[in-house]
């Protein structure tokens, strides 16, 4: 198996021209696409419909290209859209493809290479979102994805991206009508509960937390429990979790590798450099032009520190009634990463409940080997 990854700019939420160009020119085959991971220019909140709009645009395109229904497209390709391109972040999508190749002649000296596997959970009932059923279903799915990708060791997993559902007024009403409660009656807060439950599922699958320490009560409450490689993004456009596991495996060929580090806070540039160093792209204090030329994309989570401080300095992101704190945080983290890699077209998703330490989050880099 061999993974390929392509980063493509988007001029608007329905712009599939960059991907179409790659396919028309024979750079990639539509049949080999397994995931489209996008940053869309909406507000990243409950009523951000750019995520669904972009997903629909890609489903229509691939449906026509592959000659199958949109439903079938959705069953074979994970469309994970994260809304919010605040600050200098450039809207774009990252395309993951998997080619079936024979790596039997590969030597041990060639090392591990990027392995990717997409997988889907079942659809969740509204009363399950942000609670233990979502945790355990996500954990089971991540374990299956690791097996299918040939990733034997949890330490070889460097980034797990999840698109998860949220609660709307209608979904809450449905649960109540059937005699159930929901994790929260605030639609925006439900995004955090869903992200948090999904992240804890990843942590459980990778052995970062013990199941005995998990319950409905700890979700969005006990931030000492987290995954250092989880990246979860909630949206209105689905009711299941769509997951892509990224790691390194000797069973895969190609010239791509992935590494990660843990940002302690929103301005932790040292962690960004460490993630670059993890894939051989920052030998010295700062990456060189040649090293940056091998970087395919950077992926990170962003969050306004819940204690209201960054390095003992007060911040006001949580007190802004006009702009949600996740929007502030995305702009900050994107700027930090862009200042190091020299490119604002990187993937930064807001809301990092149980995704890295409180106020921080994981940062991962996919790059070509030297």
Swiss-Prot record:
GO terms for molecular function: cyanuric acid amidohydrolase activity; metal ion binding. InterPro entries: AtzD/Barbiturase, AtzD/Barbiturase_RUA, AtzD/Barbiturase_RUB, AtzD/Barbiturase_RUC. Its EC number is 3.5.2.15. Residues 1-103 are annotated as: RU A. Pathway: Xenobiotic degradation; atrazine degradation; biuret from cyanurate: step 1/1. It comes from the Bacteria. Responsible for the hydrolysis of cyanuric acid, an intermediate formed during catabolism of s-triazine based compounds in herbicides such as atrazine and polymers such as melamine. Catalyzes the hydrolytic opening of the s-triazine ring of cyanuric acid (2,4,6-trihydroxy-s-triazine) to yield carbon dioxide and carboxybiuret, which spontaneously decarboxylates to biuret. Homotetramer. HAMAP family: Cyc_amidohydrol. NCBIfam families: amido_AtzD_TrzD (TIGR02714). This is Cyanuric acid amidohydrolase. The lineage of its organism: Bacteria, Pseudomonadati, Pseudomonadota, Gammaproteobacteria, Enterobacterales.
């Amino acid at each position: 198996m061999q993974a390929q990854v392509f980063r493509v700019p988007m001029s608007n939420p329905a712009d599939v021209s960059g991907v179409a160009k790659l396919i028309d020119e024979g750079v990639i085959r539509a049949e080999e696409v397994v995931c489209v991971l996008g940053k869309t220019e909406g507000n990243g909140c409950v009523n951000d419909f750019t995520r669904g709009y972009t997903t629909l645009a890609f489903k229509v395109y691939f449906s026509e290209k592959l000659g199958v229904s949109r439903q079938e497209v959705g069953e074979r390709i994970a469309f994970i859209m994260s809304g919010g391109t605040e600050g200098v972040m450039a809207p774009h999508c990252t395309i993951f493809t998997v080619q079936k190749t024979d790596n039997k002649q590969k030597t041990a000296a060639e090392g591990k290479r990027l392995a990717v596997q997409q997988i889907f959970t079942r659809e969740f009932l509204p009363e399950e979102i942000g609670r233990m059923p979502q945790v355990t279903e996500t954990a089971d799915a991540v374990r299956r994805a690791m097996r299918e990708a040939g990733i034997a060791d949890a330490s070889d997993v460097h980034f797990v991206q999840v698109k998860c559902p949220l609660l709307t007024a209608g979904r809450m009403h449905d649960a109540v009508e059937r005699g159930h409660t929901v994790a929260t009656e605030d639609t925006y807060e439900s995004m955090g509960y869903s992200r948090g439950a999904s992240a804890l599922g990843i942590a459980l699958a990778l052995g970062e937390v013990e199941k005995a320490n998990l319950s409905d009560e700890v979700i969005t409450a006990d931030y000492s429990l987290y995954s250092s490689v989880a990246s979860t993004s909630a949206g209105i456009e689905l009711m299941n979790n769509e997951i892509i596991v990224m790691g390194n495996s000797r069973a895969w060929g190609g010239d791509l590798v992935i590494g990660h580090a843990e940002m302690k806070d929103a301005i932790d540039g040292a962690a960004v450099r460490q993630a670059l160093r993890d894939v051989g792209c920052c030998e010295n204090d700062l990456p060189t032009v040649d090293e940056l030329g091998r970087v395919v994309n950077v992926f990170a989570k962003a969050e306004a520190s819940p204690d209201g401080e960054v390095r003992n300095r007060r911040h006001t992101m949580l007190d802004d009634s006009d702009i949600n704190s996740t929007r502030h945080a995305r702009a900050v983290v994107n700027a930090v990463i862009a200042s190091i890699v020299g490119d604002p077209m990187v993937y930064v998703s807001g809301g990092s409940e149980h995704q890295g330490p409180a106020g921080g989050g994981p940062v991962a880099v996919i790059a070509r080997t030297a």
